[in-house]
C-alpha cells in the first residue's frame, strides 16, 4: 500500500520519480504526486488518479536535482487533490511524503498544533507541521527526530527542506523503506523494483532509524543519535524481470510463468541425490512442536488451508490456520510447544507482522514463507523458506499462490520422510511437481477455451458461486477471490455439501455455479450437489480432473498426484477470472481499491 521514491543527485529527478512511481503501481493507490527541488524553489504536483494523469500535469520544463514522489492509498481522508502527497508545512519550507498510519495524530494536533489550519484530512500533514514547529529552535535533523519520537504507529517518511538543497531525510518504522546507492546520486524507495533502472545496490533502513542522504553518501542513525554502519547488498532482480514484455497484462504473464516457477522450486529444494529436502534445522524445529499455527491473509490464507491438509497427512502434527487480522486480537488457546508459520508474498504484510511480533514476545518459534528475501518478516522470523516466484506485479496473486502450495508440499513431504510416513517415503515429489508443471503448460495453452467459458457465464453476471469438497473447497475459495478481485463480480466459494444449509436460497435462473472436481472419492457427491442447483435454474459449469471427468464437463484438468491437485485446478480458475475481467472492461492489473502489499493494519 502506497509507495515512496526519493532522489538526490545531479540529474533531473522528474523522470526518475515518475518512472519509479510507475514501478510501484502494483502496491495499489488512488492518487499520486511529486515534489521537485531546484535550488530553493520546490514545485509540487499531485492529483487523484493514475500516474499517467499526474505525468500529464507536470510541466515539461519542471526541474530539480532533489525530489520525492508518492502513490497514496487512502487511510485518512478521501482520495482527492488535497489529501494526495506530497504535503507541505505552513510556510512551505518542508515537504514530506509518508506511508503508514499515525495512530495518535489527533492527539498531536490538540497538544501541539491547536492553532494551525490544515489543508488536508491526513495524518501526514500533522507530521510536517510538527517538524516546522520544532525547526524554529532546532536543526532540521533534530526537529525531524523530535517529531518522530512523538509518533505512535507505522511510517516510512521522506522529507526535503527548502533551505537545504543538498540533503534528503528519511525514516521508517513498521513500513518498508531502503536506500539505493549510486555514483553522484542516491535514492530512497519503498521497494527496490522502483529504482532498479538506477541501481542494484541497496542498504536496508531498520525500524526507528533515520537516514540523512546527499548525492555523495548517507548517514544512518538511531533516533537517539547513534551512528550505524550497515553493509549493502546486490538486488537479485534485473530491471527486465519487472517488464511485461509482449504480454498485455502482468497477470497473464504471471499465470504463464507458473510452470517455470514450479520447476525453479524443484531445483531450489533438490539435493545432489535429486531428493527434495528442507534444511534439517527447520525440520527438527517443526517436529519438536506439538501444534502448528499457519497465519496468513487473503490468497496466502487459502494456500495455508492446502498446507494444513498436506502437513497433517504427512507429518501427523495438528495444524490450525488463522486469518492474520483476526489472530492478533483473539489468540487461540496455546499448546505447550506451538510453532507458527507465516505465509506472505511480500514479507511486509502489516497484519502478519503484528502477529509475528506478538508470538515472538510470547517466546514461540516462527517460520516465514515469503517471496522476498530480506523483507521484514524474513528478517524477524526464526527461519525462512523462499518461494522463488520472482516479482509478482499484478495485484491479484497467481504464481505466488502456486509457489506457496509447492513449497508447503516440499515442507510436508520432508517432514513426513523424517518421521517415516509411508506416503511421504513413496512419493517422488520432484517428479510429481514436474508433472504438475507440464499440466500447467497444457492448460495455459488452452486459453481460448477458458475465454469462451468466461464470456458465456460471467460477462454480464452480478454474482457467481464456486463449489468444491475437501481440498477442492480450498481452491473454490481462491477461485472466488480471484474473480471478485479483478472483475468485481460478487463471488463466493462454498463447500458443496453446505449448499442445502442456506446458500441454495440464493440460486435463481441463470446464476453461474462452477464446480471443481479432482477427487475420485467425492466425485459423485459433488455432481449430486451440482444437480441440485441445476434443478433450481443455475447455469452450471464443471472443471474436472481427467480421472473423474464425464461427458458434458466444460474443462478437463490434466491428471496430477492427488495431493497436488490444487496446483493444477487453480490454473483454469485464474484464467477464468482474467478473461471475465476483460469481458467486463476492468483494470486487470490494478483493480479498484486494492493494494498488492498491504502495509497498514
Swiss-Prot record:
InterPro entries: GATase_2_dom, GFAT, GFAT_N, GlmS/AgaS_SIS, GlmS/FrlB_SIS, Ntn_hydrolases_N, SIS_dom, SIS_dom_sf. The keyword Transferase applies. It is found in: Cytoplasm. Its EC number is 2.6.1.16. GO terms for molecular function: carbohydrate derivative binding; glutamine-fructose-6-phosphate transaminase (isomerizing) activity. It comes from the Bacteria. Gene3D superfamilies: Glucose-6-phosphate isomerase like protein, domain 1, Glutamine Phosphoribosylpyrophosphate, subunit 1, domain 1. Keywords: Aminotransferase, Cytoplasm, Glutamine amidotransferase, Repeat, Transferase. One of its GO terms (biological process) is UDP-N-acetylglucosamine metabolic process. It catalyses: D-fructose 6-phosphate + L-glutamine = D-glucosamine 6-phosphate + L-glutamate. It is an enzyme of class 2 (transferase). The active site is at residues 2, 596. Residues 282-421, 453-591 form the SIS domain. CDD domains: GFAT, SIS_GlmS_GlmD_1, SIS_GlmS_GlmD_2. Residues 2-216 form the Glutamine amidotransferase type-2 domain. GO terms for cellular component: cytosol. Homodimer. Catalyzes the first step in hexosamine metabolism, converting fructose-6P into glucosamine-6P using glutamine as a nitrogen source. This is Glutamine--fructose-6-phosphate aminotransferase [isomerizing]. It comes from Listeria monocytogenes serovar 1/2a (strain ATCC BAA-679 / EGD-e). The gene is glmS.
